[in-house]
Structures are given as C-alpha cells and as structure tokens.
A protein has these predicted regions:
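Acidic, serine/threonine-rich low-complexity disordered tracts
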Residues: 1-51, 57, 109-196
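An acidic-aromatic
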Residues: 41-98, 103-105
Length: 196
C-alpha cells in the first residue's frame, strides 16, 4: 500500500439502506508497516468517530492490529473515556489457498468507568478460504478470495454471527456480509471508492 492511498467503505443495514460511510487514508508507510486512518460518517454525513490502526507486512503475511476489529460505532460511544485493548492481531497469509484455515483472532476492550470497569470481548474464529470470485462494486471489478468466519461479541450477553469476506490482493476488503445465527443477512459493507 502506498502512502496517500484513499478508499471508502459504505455500510448497509439489512434493508439495504446506507447506515454509515467509512473513509480511509493510508498514512505513514515504512518498510514493512503502515498506519490506516479512518473517519466514519452516518448516512446524513455527520461524523460519528475517527481512529487509526496499524498494518504490518511480514514473511508470514499481513497482520492487522486487533484494535481494528472493534466496530467504529462502538468505539465512538467511548471516545471520551479511558479504554484499554489487548488481543491477537488478524493475520492474512501472503499465499492464500482455497480450503486453507486461517488463525483465530480476538480483542478484549476494557472501558474504565470508576468505580466499575466494563469489558467487551470480540472473537473471530473458524476462518477459512472458501473459494475465488470476481465481484463488481462502484469502485471497480476485483478478483477476490472468499473467506468465511464466525464472530462472537460478549458484553454481558453473547452475540454470534457468521461472515463472508471478499478480499482482493492490493486492495483489501472489497465486500463483507454478516449473517445472524438463523442465517439471515443483517448487514454488509462494500468498497465504493478506491484512489491510489
């Protein structure tokens, strides 16, 4: 990824209505790492939150900072508070193969609200490369690997979902769909602009 690369992910709800727009820019690229900065706006253009996270390239593949796994809407709710995060980074190997299993990832977020601490745990597991597919979005046509995984969020109650991700070399996420445990689509994200 080159410094200054910009891209946009549009988030849709289960009724296919825009629920948010995320604008990303690649900042501070070094030999084997980069910082991603993003701003999230609601469907009316009002800024909800902004944040950044790191990406590292190694011989094993690309690792994405575990903090990126927390939803921007959630982070926006706690931006005035002291938040601690620990976890395991998300790894995408350099050479993906259909049928390949990918390592699990997790993040634990602790929000300090004296006298209490609130904890939220997010796990990504059963990550697997299911196939290859070419898909077209407003940003263009992309050859993608299709990756499926399950996610589990725990904050008092446990919420599980299954996900399907279309990942393209040199571009990253092109599309993602999220399903509830009954298999109904509850949301999707699509790459709607990309500018190098």
């Amino acid at each position: 990824m080159d410094e200054g690369t910009k891209f946009q992910i549009t988030v849709y709800d289960k009724k296919d209505k825009v629920s948010g727009i995320m604008d990303y820019v690649v900042k501070e690229v070094s030999e084997n790492s980069a910082t991603m900065f993003y701003e999230m706006h609601d469907e009316k253009g009002k800024m909800i939150t902004s944040s950044e996270y790191g990406i590292t390239c190694t011989n094993d593949g690309i690792t994405i900072d575990f903090s990126s796994m927390m939803s921007p809407e959630l982070l926006g709710q706690y931006e005035e508070m002291e938040v601690e995060m620990t976890g395991t980074d998300l790894l995408y190997p350099n050479n993906l193969n259909v049928g390949q299993s990918l390592p699990d990832a997790d993040v634990l977020m602790t929000v300090k609200m004296p006298p209490l601490n609130m904890k939220m745990n997010m796990n990504f597991f059963n990550r697997k490369v299911e196939g290859n597919e070419s898909i077209t979005t407003p940003a263009g046509t992309f050859d993608c690997y299709v990756i499926t995984y399950d996610s589990e969020a725990k904050m008092g109650i446990k919420m599980t979902s299954s996900n399907k991700l279309w990942l393209s070399e040199g571009y990253g996420m092109v599309k993602q769909e999220t399903y509830n445990k009954k298999g109904a689509l509850i949301g999707k994200s699509i790459l709607t602009a990309f500018e190098k």
